[in-house]
Amino acid sequence: MNKEVIPVTEIPKFQSRAEEFFPIQWYKEMLNNSPVYFHEETNTWNVFQYEHVKQVLSNYDFFSSDGQRTTIFVGDNSKKKSTSPITNLTNLDPPDHRKARSLLAAAFTPRSLKNWEPRIKQIAADLVEAIQKNSTINIVDDLSSPFPSLVIADLFGVPVKDRYQFKKWVDILFQPYDQERLEEIEQEKQRAGAEYFQYLYPIVIEKRSNLSDDIISDLIQAEVDGETFTDEEIVHATMLLLGAGVETTSHAIANMFYSFLYDDKSLYSELRNNRELAPKAVEEMLRYRFHISRRDRTVKQDNELLGVKLKKGDVVIAWMSACNMDETMFENPFSVDIHRPTNKKHLTFGNGPHFCLGAPLARLEMKIILEAFLEAFSHIEPFEDFELEPHLTASATGQSLTYLPMTVYR
């Protein structure tokens, strides 16, 4: 299906990159004054409160993932038709979605995560060890960018030498559509998609004869009701997993350290002295400092579930990052508090049938890299002359850090 891309950046109309990076004032405004908002220019309904967002994401009888318009794409917006449930996974509703999702979930079982943990810890330890003591580093280049790429290359079972090529493909495949560069971006995505396919397809074929402990081997062996993946479907499946395995995690790690430096400077010291709190810190960072996250749904039948008259075919955008600031769910939501008991109820990874498959891996990676950093460095300090605005760039998840300097002390 060739979908129309909704120019979602036209809805908030941010005045700067920094404002888009952390639009806390806009969240407040929409939550308090326009919780259900119709945006005429994009012809979309927008919801921001926790219960509304949860309803739109989970109630597939009324809000469908399949529609002619969308806010986000994985890969390219090609006109080539595909009947593969994996290729179309993000557009499927239950029950069609369930079988494809179950096959894909074979890559993220609790057993797999437990088996992967030592490998991920070793990658984290190697990166942290390479950082010189009492030095100023760029956390993006030195840690948050290479770490997830190294991990996913290892978990896919591909040569480590290709890890940076993975990151390049991810940057292109998940870049946002720009109304002024639609055709150019489309061509870039199609080229990157073709390169990725040509690279990974032979690896999948080879692994069918040489199974090992990696995600591709798990996908080869996955079976639900007698159905298995084709080689082509496995390549497409790995492309979906790249979003959470590299793109999302890389930005989340950088944002976590930004928060330690600029939101609450006492937090790093607290975590250093109480390292068992690392999982709580990860959840609060996912709630408070994640990028703008949203999902679109198409109304399947007329309803008034959101307190307004919705017509079949209407598009509703659920703003998860805004609902994470809803004070009916999170006390004092506009402040960092790793001890808030409801933090894990955030909807950063979605809700319902399309809850992010890679969420457990993203959480595990963030926890491991934070624990490794806390073990190695006694404290961190911000770079005195750092300016945020010049060091942000547009990404699939909003504005992302390209440079974050800090001084580290062992």
From Swiss-Prot:
Give the SUPFAM superfamilies listed for this entry: Cytochrome P450 (SSF48264)
Determine the domain of life of the protein's source.
Answer: Bacteria
Function (record text): Cytochromes P450 are a group of heme-thiolate monooxygenases. They oxidize a variety of structurally unrelated compounds, including steroids, fatty acids, and xenobiotics.
Q: What is its main location?
A: cytoplasm
Keywords, A to Z, come to:
Cytoplasm, Heme, Iron, Metal-binding, Monooxygenase, Oxidoreductase
Protein source organism:
Priestia megaterium (strain ATCC 14581 / DSM 32 / CCUG 1817 / JCM 2506 / NBRC 15308 / NCIMB 9376 / NCTC 10342 / NRRL B-14308 / VKM B-512 / Ford 19)
Please report the name of this protein according to its UniProt entry: Cytochrome P450(BM-1)
Organism ancestry: Bacteria, Bacillati, Bacillota, Bacilli, Bacillales
What does the sequence similarity comment in the record state about its family?
Answer: Belongs to the cytochrome P450 family.
The UniProt entry, under InterPro entries, shows: Cyt_P450, Cyt_P450_B, Cyt_P450_CS, Cyt_P450_sf
Q: Which GO molecular function annotations are given, in alphabetical order?
A: heme binding; iron ion binding; monooxygenase activity; oxidoreductase activity, acting on paired donors, with incorporation or reduction of molecular oxygen
What cofactor is needed?
A: heme
Query: What are the EC numbers?
Result: 1.14.14.-
